[in-house]
Amino acid sequence: MSQETIISNLIDMLKVSAGWDREANEISGRLFHKLMDMSSTETISQYMSLFGPLLEPHILEFIQNYEQEIDEVCLEYRASYDFMCLRNCGILPAKRFYDTYVLPPRTEMNGKYESIPHFFARIAAYCAWNCIMCEPLKDTLVYVQKRDWNVEIKTDMQIFKYFYKVISSQLVCCATPVMRSAGVAGENLSSCFIIAPTLDTEKSTISSIFGELAPLLASRSGVGVDVTKFSFGGKNIHSCLKLINAQVEFFNDKSVRPVSVATYIEVWHCQIHEFLSAKLPENPDRCNSIFQGVCVPSLFFKMYESDPNGLWYLFDPQDAPNLTRLYGLEFEEEYLRLVSEKKYKQSVTLKSLMFSLINTIIKTGSPYVISKEAMNKHHWYETQGEAINCSNLCAEIVQQPKQFTSTCNLANVCLPKCLNSSNFPYTCSNTAQFDFSKLEYAVQAAVFIINACILSPSPTSSATVGQRERSMGIGCHGLADVFSEMGYGYLDLESECLDRDIFETMYYTAVKTSSEICSVGKGQPFAGFRKSKLAHGVFHWATWDAMPQRVPMKQWIHLQDNIKKFGVFNSQFIALMPTAGTSQLTGYTDSFYPYFANMSSKVSNKEEIMKPNITFLKNVKPQDLCTVRFYGGDVSMMPEDVSTRYKHFLTAFDYCPEAQMRRASIRAPYVDQSQSLTLFLTEENVQSAKYLKDLLLLGFRLGLKTIMYYCRVKKTTKLLQLECLKLDEHTKKDAQIVLADLARELPDSHKTEDACPLDQSECIACQ
């Protein structure tokens, strides 16, 4: 048999035990990387000959000019601790790199993949070139590196190395469009688009859906669509949703990167019930490929709290054009005026509409629920008269798309990379410390990466206009891993303080770095800066009546003065998106969520791969492993002495949903866009509509912008997870022999007989 066949057979034997056998998981991942090395690019010269025709000419020229230096950087990376950690994250991250992110072979005859070191080099070259070409970015980067980190940057190659180190270490994870397409000619790098198309005639609806929406979906990004203005000729809104659904299905046919659309409507729309039924499982003509969201004015919640049996009036948007434009008190006055003038189409009880909403949520997991007042009250400029009433695909982006296509570029910080401990990440010693200086370094880098990507072409002229606001969305993943490594439960008081401090630091650092692109780099402030609240010295946290706790007030005041004098380069900064795609590459938990499960799986159209929570698994004592496996890793079900030992590894379904919402409100003052807040419920929670209704009302009272992104319900019964309980030791031995070849390829200082210590542990349209 060939070496490739031997390795493939070993991987197949090992991965069936990759759930509970940590060593099998790591070895199978390393073997898969070794297997792919055999069919991946080896040198920059080879890379350019194979993938050069795909790249933008100036990126190809940059790589050609520094071919030898980039080759050396890639070789150093192959022998680095960072690369060792990446290759030892397990079989799932290894698979995801090659089936989703690196450039695939261009032809079957020359079937070479883009190697992982060259994958990072392509992204770094793109960021470096754009940074070099944009003088404000370059000058600011050079300045802050010297001032804050005592690192001198004098050459273009040093800029490349800066980006390469940050990206290849996975301290900052780029969004999926950036990883897949940075440097590739004609590709879009934006993650999110939001449009508010004109839907008041048949002609305008067709023009909007096929003229505005189609090019955005073709760019492989998620899109939020406001359909509140749908109104003409008695047509049913379901027909419009079917058109959108068909487009999504067309673009997803045989596509590696699925995309989708989230359609949003306000709850006073006369076809709200038709909208809510569009995805119901009992609907034979349901729209399976799109998502839904509802924008709820504060008046609805207040009236419900006052009298659930009271009437709620529904309007045709042509009869009530101002309702979309207003929020808060002005909305209430307009609504009551229209009611008094009997402009409504029909009336329903508040309770019946609330029940319809909750019924759809329980059956489909959506619609997302966003608060119209919170979205607008905390926006970067006053929106009264042009109110925001929709969001993006994952409900974490807050922008006003009325005149153009709103656009946002994303990146996220891998928070566990900011932990310092002599033992981390070898074991959970409860002595790990969070390094805020490393977090600041990461956020600075994210600002430069995103601004470099903002310079990329947009798929439509309307999106190009939207990019003038230079909206950023810096998120995170691995927050739950940070808490457990430090010995905190997700909802402990200590984790609450750390949670708040992390996002305060992220917001402060992002705003400061962006302002220095104007003050140091002499960049022009974003379009619309003069009307912004920042121009008047009002930070996002001030609109929440919150007071910063970690960053001294004198630093905020100094930043405030600097912004008033010089401006700020970006309009928005922090957005906590789901990171289901990118977090698979690091093995850490998705976004800011608690652990979803200590044992789960990822299913594709090819196979099912076990996904253990490695942060949990590496801390399971040998004597507890049988017990832990018996209960499927569910800490809440284990005997008291065992569950106490692993209390930091409770899952999202074990924690009180109300407490999770309150935690979201604590970090909210420092999240100037929004949070994709998922509700994790049990079947017991949703036996009646009351519990979910109370959660939605709580979200309103807490002032959350995104009251609910998605609702996940944990089933009481579980299917047995089928996997090999005891792996044949001969299989492991054979695998280790094959891996010995890999060890010989590394310098002595990087050889190890042990598995890599850094092994922590959907839709990827946003990340």
Swiss-Prot record:
This is Ribonucleoside-diphosphate reductase large subunit. GO terms for biological process: deoxyribonucleotide biosynthetic process; DNA replication; viral process. One of its GO terms (molecular function) is ribonucleoside-diphosphate reductase activity, thioredoxin disulfide as acceptor. It catalyses: a 2'-deoxyribonucleoside 5'-diphosphate + [thioredoxin]-disulfide + H2O = a ribonucleoside 5'-diphosphate + [thioredoxin]-dithiol. Keywords: ATP-binding, Disulfide bond, DNA replication, Early protein, Nucleotide-binding, Oxidoreductase. Its EC number is 1.17.4.1. It comes from Saimiriine herpesvirus 2 (strain 11) (SaHV-2). The record marks C192, C408 as: Important for hydrogen atom transfer. Substrate binds at T176, S191, C192, G222, N392, L393, C394, A395, E396, P578, T579, A580, G581, T582. The active site is at N392 (proton acceptor), C394 (cysteine radical intermediate), E396 (proton acceptor). The record marks Y709, Y710 as: Important for electron transfer. PROSITE patterns: RIBORED_LARGE. Gene3D superfamilies: 3.20.70.20. Disulfide bonds join C192-C408. Heterotetramer composed of a homodimer of the large subunit (R1) and a homodimer of the small subunit (R2). Larger multisubunit protein complex are also active, composed of (R1)n(R2)n. Ribonucleoside-diphosphate reductase holoenzyme provides the precursors necessary for viral DNA synthesis. Allows virus growth in non-dividing cells, as well as reactivation from latency in infected hosts. Catalyzes the biosynthesis of deoxyribonucleotides from the corresponding ribonucleotides. Belongs to the ribonucleoside diphosphate reductase large chain family.
